[in-house]
């Protein structure tokens, strides 16, 4: 399983039932327990200008409670950054399997969890360590 960021040169890998790595460095999710000190990321659907479920309401709800919200790259890259402890959490709506499959496995090997929001449109997930996922779920719908 592999996630590659061509622009940054990062390569994230998962060794089946062993560990996840970036450039041979073993990955571990961050240990933060609250959103107040957390940097999290999210994304927006390609049709955000006409889609009423465009995630902007979730950003507005959560932003007062976090240290910062970022938008870095693809869903796979952002989830891999959570696996590396570079981000504390991530959520996004209306994704596809190819957006997240490899990164979810990398995150699991790094000790993280993914929660499926089970929405009507595509795959919608929250990712991070267990505590941060629970915190994000208070604000993301």
Specify the residue positions occupied by each region the protein language model found.
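Single conserved hydrophobic/aromatic residue that forms the stacking wall/gate
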Residues: 1-12
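Solvent-exposed alpha-helices and their adjacent loops that cap or buttress functional pockets
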Residues: 5-6, 31-34, 61, 117-120
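Conserved acidic residues
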Residues: 9, 38, 88
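A conserved active-site-flanking secondary-structure segment within enzyme catalytic domains
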Residues: 10-36
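Short loop segments at secondary-structure junctions
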Residues: 15-17, 25, 45, 110-111, ...
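Anionic-ligand binding region
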Residues: 22-27, 53-60
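Short loop->beta-strand "edge-of-pocket" segments that line small-molecule binding or catalytic clefts
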Residues: 26-49, 63-72
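Oxyanion/phosphate-interacting regions
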Residues: 57-64, 77-141
């Amino acid at each position: 399983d592999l996630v590659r960021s061509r622009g940054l040169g990062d390569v994230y890998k998962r060794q089946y039932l062993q560990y996840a790595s970036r450039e041979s460095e073993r990955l571990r999710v961050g240990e933060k327990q609250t959103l107040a000190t957390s940097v999290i990321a999210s994304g927006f659907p390609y049709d955000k200008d006409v889609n009423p479920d465009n995630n902007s309401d979730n950003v507005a709800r959560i932003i007062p409670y976090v240290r910062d919200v970022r938008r870095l790259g693809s869903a796979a890259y952002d989830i891999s950054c959570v696996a590396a402890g570079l981000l504390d959490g991530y959520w996004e709506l209306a994704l596809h399997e190819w957006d997240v499959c490899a990164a979810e496995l990398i995150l699991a090997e790094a000790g993280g969890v993914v929660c499926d929001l089970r929405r009507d449109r595509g795959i919608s997930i929250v990712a991070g360590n267990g505590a941060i996922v629970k915190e994000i779920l208070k604000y993301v719908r």
